[in-house]
């Protein structure tokens, strides 16, 4: 008879162990690393949200840390908002004072943003390991109150999670931090090869952003595009959208003038997220961008291209 059979536990006993002792491995991790981490004058930064939100938040945080002279480590988590590791989208970052890595299984227990889905377990680790922590829900209110992020970060040993551009940054920094992988870059170049002497970019967001739907109706985009075509007969349109219906409508109206992805938008797969990067960086290469209201994707495309 095996030990497992001889000493098998009843269901109530197993449940008692889980509830009372399951935290022990986490505590071991905490105390094994506390001395090492607490001696480091740095910031642990977690970018949150979708692709564009993460990009601008990372640029803001890195600029802040360079300003105050604190090292920065960033951990990239996969979740419902962006289900892809950093290394599957972009080249490794080579910037002084910044280390970015994809999250490990242990990071999900210790460094992820505390929330209902993880039973707020990471908060225990973060309270013990960091001098202070600011989570994404507090960033915008603090900025409106003119919170001194520099003084807060300068002391080091802090944790920050954000999806906003809470600190000003040079738009050129985006191009240094986020370099698309070669296969993604080839797609961007292929779209640009189809540009005319006057190519405009259009980003129409429809599926999950109510403000964009209400404030940026399709009629406004059509009016703007029609004006461009009337003023320049060589006008072409690069369209980035998450709506297949919009693609069909624009193809019907503008025919060969329209350049757009044939694949359906999907941010839940790595291939789909790569497609989003292609759209963003191709928009950045157009002469002018007509974007959607309150869309960080439109804003980032404009910042990347200086449009």
Where do the protein language model's features map onto the residues?
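Short hydrophobic alpha-helical segments enriched in small aliphatic residues
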Residues: 22, 29-32
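A short, glycine/small-residue-rich beta-strand->loop->alpha-helix junction that serves as a flexible
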Residues: 47-56, 209-215
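Short, solvent-exposed loop/turn segments at secondary-structure junctions
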Residues: 50-52, 77-82, 165-166, 205-209, ...
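Histidine-anchored nucleotide/phosphate-binding helix
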Residues: 55-66, 221-222
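Secretory-pathway luminal glycosyltransferase catalytic domains
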Residues: 84-232
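Donor-binding and catalytic core of enzymes assembling or modifying cell-surface/extracellular glycoconjugates
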Residues: 235-307
């Amino acid at each position: 008879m095996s030990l497992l059979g001889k000493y098998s536990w009843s269901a109530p006993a197993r449940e008692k162990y889980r509830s009372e002792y399951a935290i022990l491995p986490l505590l071991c991790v905490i105390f094994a690393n506390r001395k090492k981490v607490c001696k480091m004058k740095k910031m642990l930064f977690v970018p949150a949200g979708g692709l564009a939100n993460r990009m601008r938040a990372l640029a803001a945080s890195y600029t802040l840390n360079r300003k105050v002279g604190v090292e920065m480590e960033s951990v990239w988590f996969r979740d419902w908002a962006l289900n892809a590791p950093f290394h599957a989208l972009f080249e490794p970052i080579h910037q002084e004072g910044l280390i970015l890595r994809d999250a490990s299984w242990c990071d999900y227990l210790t460094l992820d943003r505390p929330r209902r889905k993880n039973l707020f377990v990471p908060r225990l680790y973060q309270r013990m390991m960091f001098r202070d922590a600011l989570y994404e829900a507090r960033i915008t209110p603090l900025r409106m109150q003119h919170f001194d992020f520099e003084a807060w970060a300068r002391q080091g040993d802090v944790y920050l999670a954000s999806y906003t551009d809470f600190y000003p940054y040079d738009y050129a920094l985006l191009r240094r931090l986020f370099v698309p992988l070669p296969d993604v870059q080839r797609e961007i170049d292929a779209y640009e090869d189809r540009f005319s002497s006057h190519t405009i970019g259009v980003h129409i967001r429809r599926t999950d952003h109510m403000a964009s739907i209400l404030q940026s109706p399709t009629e406004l985009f059509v009016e703007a595009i029609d004006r461009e075509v009337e003023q320049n007969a060589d006008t072409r349109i690069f369209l980035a959208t998450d709506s297949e219906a919009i693609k069909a409508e624009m193809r019907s109206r503008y025919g060969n003038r329209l350049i757009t992805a044939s694949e359906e938008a999907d941010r839940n797969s790595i291939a789909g997220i790569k497609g989003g990067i292609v759209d963003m960086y191709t928009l950045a290469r157009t002469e002018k961008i007509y974007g959607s209201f309150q869309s960080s994707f439109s804003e980032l495309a404009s910042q990347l291209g200086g449009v």
